[in-house]
Structure formats: structure tokens, C-alpha cells
Amino acid sequence: MNQPAIKHALNVKRADDFAQWYQAVIAEAELAEESGVRGCMVIKPWGYGIWERIQKLMDAEIKEAGVENCYFPLFIPLSYFTKEAEHVEGFAKEMAVVTHHRLISDGKGGLTPDPEAKLEEPLVVRPTSETVIGAAMSRWIQSWRDLPLLTNQWANVVRWEMRTRMFLRTSEFLWQEGHTAHVDEADAMKETLRALEMYRAFAEGPLAMPVIAGPKPENERFPGAVETFSIEAMMQDGKALQAGTSHYLGTTFAKAAGIQYQNKEGQQALAHTTSWGVSTRLIGGVIMTHGDDDGLRVPPQVAPQQIVILPMLRDNEGDDALLAYCEEIRASLVKLSVFGERIRVLLDKRPGKATQKRWAWVKKGMPLILEIGGRDAEGGLVSVLRRDRLWRQDAKPNFVGQAKDDFLASAATELESIQAALYDEARARRDAQIVRDVTDLEGLKGYFAEGNKYPGWVEMGWAKPTGEALDKVVEQLKALKLTIRNTPMDAEKPVGACPFTGEPAVEKILIARSY
């Protein structure tokens, strides 16, 4: 007997067109929308609520490490960038620049920059803050006693992207950027790796998004960095998403900004600096890691609300008793804790059919949905729908009827179960798509051939070439639309030769298509 077909909430499926599906999830889940400025988005309440959860949880981790929050100017003098040649070259094509401070009428009903109001020095709209924070550090640091100096800021940045996609690559985005200064390389590298581990644990914990951490190859380093480390997540189409980076900057920026200190021997020395950051790109990662053909599925730890209660109102005299019952359940739930916090519950009393509101919340990815009718209220019952177990075999929503008290006793456990299930599902999918039996360039070409619609990642041996030899490999990979993501820190030692150079492999690398 054939199983009945499921009628999914979205009109486009992941398997048919992943890019269109991604845009559909953003629209239907009401996460964000395009604005009147190319490449800039309006983040709607549900999308911003996820970012606020990320902020709250990560800010606590940052402060636990002794890092203090600051705020630095949005506008940075152009001369700050010209002090560090490699850094300015890396960002030059993306910089937005302010040249005037006043507008005047153009005589045609419009406005134009006032020629008399040209700035003496152009101001760059913050693409990242190493230069301006370095200038502040040079004033704050005098002695070894001032180190380490650990700062962070939550801010917006602007990088004028040519090809934009909401949450993944926008001209303006929100992020946190940590900037620290240290007495020597060892202490700075310790901080670089601490931040990397914080990001790894955060991705795999609250975001339920498995990642692989490791150093980037020389050609993929942050402009001006000595070493760049990343966490890489696999999306459901097999592409890699760089979800966070941590950089050891050596004395490069200290030299440019004059960050010096008097060491214990009374001599002047340059500080060693780091920077590290994650952005609203994490929300794009959550969408493409956990979304399905019915919309978004939000891990409970970062969901703005974890449970929604939908009373099935009839516009009759029984509604008051039903609402009172629903409020009683809400009041009981918010006294309970999960993941070290109170459970977040919304009683949705908006007018409209409960079924319509149910599908709106399904598309938003609400972890638990309760539907409660008049008979449920009379019998002390609830109907519970887990977003990660949406469908029954008969293609109907997988509601489970429970006694109210039983649900209250199990609500926290259910949320923990959803969090774990989302991670386990994503981890199993990723692990199944990391290929380790490709050993030469022809095999690489074959794996990423057009017939393989959603290939995963290839892990290969690597001789760690530099200079022209590395450039040659980068061009070979570019022709296949591939990049080296990173060197997995927990990978086994390679055996045999590097497929690109023929020399003995000294480490392993991940090769993938990416966002």
C-alpha cells in the first residue's frame, strides 16, 4: 500500500533548488527581507530574536574569559588603513568611504554633496576594527602590567559585496569582534585558540551545528594575519560555511599602530595581538543546517520562544475558560528551567484559525507547538507537536495527546531531546558526506563533476606548499570552483603523497565548494 503524499508548507524543496529554498525559508519564517539599499537587509523580529539569543549566550562566554566590552567609532580615518599595506589591500575593494559632511540643494528638487563640505581626510565606514582599536590600544598600553588587554565589541560593519545573499553575504552585517593584546606569541596564540574553541563549542552546543576547527591555508588568511583559524560547517547542499574565525596577528598591527610596552627588563617591546569574530552569518548556517521542506527548525537554545500555545478559539462563551486554561499552562511552564534558563513560552491569542497559526509557527521553526481546544481544557489535556518530528506515516501532523501534568513534567526533557536530535541529525549527515578515498586530482574532478548535484567535502593529504606552488594549487582548485577550507585539528596523520605536489603529505586538508 502506497503511503499518502505529504503536503509540505513550502512551495520549493531543498532537493529541487537549494538556493530558492533558502530564500523561501527566510521569507516564510519571517526572518528578514530586502531593504531599499542593495545588499542590506531588514532583520525582522523572529530573525533578530535568534541573533539576540546568540548575543546573550556568547556574551556570557566572552565575559567569562575576562574579556570586556567596548565600543569604537563606525568611521575610521583612511590613514589608519594605509599604515598596514596587506590589510588595506585585502579590504580596499569592499570599503565604503565618506568624503563629505553636508548636503545642499541641487536646484532641481534634489540633494547633492556640498563642494565646500569635503572632508580633509576621507573616512572609511568600519569593515573591521583592527586599525581603530589598535590606535586605542597604543594609548592604553604602557607597561607589561597592562597586558593582556582583552576587548570585544558588538557592532555593525560594512563591506561592499558584489554578490549578496541574506545572512550569508551582505553589505552590512552584525557581529562581535574580539581584539586582544599580549606580551608574547605564546600568550597571544593561547588566546587565539581559546576563542576558536569557544566558537566550536558554541556552534556545536546552542546552534546544534557540527563544525570542524583548524588553521586556514596561507592564501586564505585574514589580511595581515600570521595565522588564521576557522570553524567550518557543512550545509545540507554539501557546501562549506565558514562560521567563525580567530586570527593570530603577530606584531603586524602593533607595529603599524605603535602598540608598545615596557617589559620587565625595562625595554620597549611590541605587543602581540589577536582578533576573532562571528556574525549574523550564523543564522544563515542555522537555516541551511536545520531547515526542512516545511521551513526553519530552530534549536531550542537559540529560539526566541521555545513553546507556543495555540488556543482553538470558537468566538463563544467557552473561550474565556479555554484562555484561562492556556494561561495556567503558560504560567506553569515559565517557572520551569532548561539549559540553565527559564523556559520561554508564548501564548498566541491573536485572532485567526489555530491551524493557520500552527503552520506559521511550523515555518518559523518553533520547537514545541501546543494546540488546545475546549475539550482539552475540560479534560486537562494538551496536544503536542515537536517541530523536529512533524509528520506521521499517514502524512498528518504528528500531534501527541498528553495529560497536562505529564507534559509539564516532560517539557524540559522534550526541549533537550530536540536540541540533541537536531545536532545528531546534522552530524550524521555531515560525516556521511566527508569523502576520504579520493587520492588524486582526477578523482577530485570526478567527485565534484556536474552529475553530483550536492557533493560533500573531500579530505586529502597535503604537503603544505607555499609561494608559487601554493598559487598553482589554488588555481587548479579555482577552476573546479573549490577551495581549501582548513586543516582539521583532530584529523589522523596522512599516509602517502600530496596529490597536488607529489611530495610526502604532512597534514590533511578539507576541500569543498563554499559560501
Swiss-Prot record:
Recorded catalytic activity of this chain's protein: tRNA(Pro) + L-proline + ATP = L-prolyl-tRNA(Pro) + AMP + diphosphate
A Pfam family recorded for this sequence: HGTP_anticodon
Function (record text): Catalyzes the attachment of proline to tRNA(Pro) in a two-step reaction: proline is first activated by ATP to form Pro-AMP and then transferred to the acceptor end of tRNA(Pro).
GO terms for MF: ATP binding; proline-tRNA ligase activity
EC category name: ligase
Domain notes: Consists of three domains: the N-terminal catalytic domain, the anticodon-binding domain and the C-terminal extension.
Subcellular localization(s) per the UniProt record: Cytoplasm
CDD domains membership: ProRS_core_arch_euk (cd00778)
SUPFAM superfamilies: C-terminal domain of ProRS (SSF64586), Class II aaRS ABD-related (SSF52954), Class II aaRS and biotin synthetases (SSF55681)
GO cellular component, one term: cytoplasm
Annotated keywords: Aminoacyl-tRNA synthetase, ATP-binding, Cytoplasm, Ligase, Nucleotide-binding, Protein biosynthesis
Family: Belongs to the class-II aminoacyl-tRNA synthetase family. ProS type 3 subfamily.
Entries under InterPro entries matching the protein: aa-tRNA-synt_IIb (IPR002314), aa-tRNA-synth_II (IPR006195), aa-tRNA-synth_II/BPL/LPL (IPR045864), Anticodon-bd (IPR004154), Anticodon-bd_dom_sf (IPR036621), Pro-tRNA-ligase_IIa_arc-type (IPR004499), Pro-tRNA_ligase_II_C (IPR016061), Pro-tRNA_synth_II (IPR017449)
One GO BP annotation of this record: prolyl-tRNA aminoacylation
Enzyme Commission (EC) number: 6.1.1.15
Protein name per its UniProtKB record: Proline--tRNA ligase
Subunit details: Homodimer.
